[in-house]
Amino acid sequence: MQRSCRTRRRVSVNKFNGRNSFYKVSLSLVFLLWVLLFFSTLLISHGDGAKDEPLNDSMGMADPDDGQSDEKVVPFDGPLSLASASVDVTSDLSRNDDVNLSEESEDKEQEAEISSTVSGNDIESKDTYLLKQSEINKKDTGIDAGSKYDDFPKKSEINNTGTWNDTEGKDDNNFLKQSQLNKTGTGNDTESSDNEFLEQNQMNKTVLGNGTEINVSKVDQPSRAVPLGLDEFKSRASNSRNKSLSDQVSGVIHRMEPGGKEYNYASASKGAKVLSSNKEAKGAASILSRDNDKYLRNPCSTEGKFVVVELSEETLVNTIKIANFEHYSSNLKEFELQGTLVYPTDTWVHMGNFTASNVKHEQNFTLLEPKWVRYLKLNFISHYGSEFYCTLSLIEVYGVDAVERMLEDLISVQDNKNAYKPREGDSEHKEKPMQQIESLEGDDGADKSTHREKEKEAPPENMLAKTEASMAKSSNKLSEPVEEMRHHQPGSRMPGDTVLKILMQKLRSLDLNLSILERYLEELNLRYGNIFKEMDREAGVREKAIVALRLDLEGMKERQEGMVSEAEEMKEWRKRVEAEMEKAEKEKENIRQSLEQVSKRLEWMEKKCLTVFTVCLGFGIIAVIAVVIGMGTGLAEKTGSGAWLLLLISSTFIMFVLSL
């Protein structure tokens, strides 16, 4: 019995010691686990807890760009607080997760650009307002324009209010974008409305200009045929005369000798002579006669070789002829021709530079512009070959006689026929003035007054026709002596009686033309008097139109002042809106910072919960193992097994709660 009791006591003591050792080991393990949990919590709390991606991944939050969030944006006029901002924390977190430094910098740059755009739009809008007001249609009463500009600020305020209401229900990033779009849109709307208004005003101006042109055409409707001025008439006659003279010059008919040869004005037999030459020249007078054995001789090395020839008469020089027949000499190459009407003189008229060929026969040179001269000067510039002497055998000059040319200038049948040729459609008008002129020469004063009344009724073109007809008539009267002159001997002078007869007839024609010009001036005076009366009447009408335009401009100026004041009010309103926008952006930045702190706190709590869950899971596993071992050995007591069961239940409950 004693042995069994001792055995039992020993067994119980061993069990108690084993139980104590087990509890000690268990307590040491629990203490070690709690120490490990504490250090792991500290390490996790000081780790990479500021990242946003783990929070999104762990909490299963959606990307703010994918869906349409339901959070609300507090209006500018309403107070902003953390309580109102934390109504929906999940949406706020999802809204701020994608905000980073690069996006903030981009937003600031965009805001700066938009602010500059808005300021530029303000200036443009102000300038366009002034343009608009200055280009308002003058036909409008001004009421529509005033109501339009009065409604413009109201419409802008309504649009801006609608913009703020529409932006409620968007996230902060969308809010920024929408505000930027609103700013840009406001400027674009202003510019588009201004452009439309300018286009409309330009169309109105075009219509107004067309109307003004129509009115002017209506005012100018009574057509008035302005007659040609006297200067224009004289210039027309002189131009036709000059044209005929130029035609004659281009086709100059040289004066002919009785034998049919051309008249040489540089012939010694006609009275021409050599006046001077360079001192080295020998035989200068030989060039005025046709003797092949005589010539003008100059050493080729001499500088400034020249010869001055006096023509037999003053003439219109058109052609000169030179020749060198000496074989053993150098031919003339380049020479200059000068002329004058008086000698001696210091100023010679340049008539042309010519280049001769290296030949031993006569060469003709025609002047581009024939000149009236009496004295010719030939300057020898260069020569051909390398002979010692440069020779010239012959020089001849051809042209028109001065007296004959003067008579042709005074009275030319061809010129009169060409200058006063009737125009198409005016033959009927010109026949009547010719008859009137003939009747004026033979009728008395009463007939003259009757004809003058008829002439006043006729248009001024008839007066021009009368003048032309009278001059044509006078030219017909003067044609007979000219024909006599033309049929006279070709090389002889006309008698003095013929010249006097021609001059007297010319004076008669001038007297007749003077009377016609006097009547022409009377007609011009009458016509221009009527024109001035019409111009005075038109000036009165235009003065009334100018007064009306001045009144319109005064009304436009008043409307412009009103529009400028409205533009200033709009500018102030924009400044207030910009200030509110800046305030809202600052409050948004504060909310974003607070939400970042909340997100960090939540992430830290999440990691703590994860740690606690891990520890509880470990304790639960240990408790399960202990219970299984106790049940397997059958040595566990109820108190010990109950403690492990309690630990298992508590760990399971904590894990269940954390998993929810």
Swiss-Prot record:
Topology relative to the membrane: Multi-pass membrane protein
Domain SUN positions: 238-402
Parts of the chain that traverse the membrane: 25-45, 612-632, 640-660
Bias kind Acidic residues: ranges: 100-112
Residue ranges, compositional bias (Basic and acidic residues): 141-157, 421-433, 445-459
Ranges where the record places region Disordered: 50-75, 93-120, 141-194, 418-496
A biological process from GO: response to water deprivation
Quaternary structure (record): Forms homomers and heteromers with SUN4. Interacts with SUN1, SUN2, SUN5, TIK and WIP1.
Entry protein name: SUN domain-containing protein 3
Source organism: Arabidopsis thaliana (Mouse-ear cress)
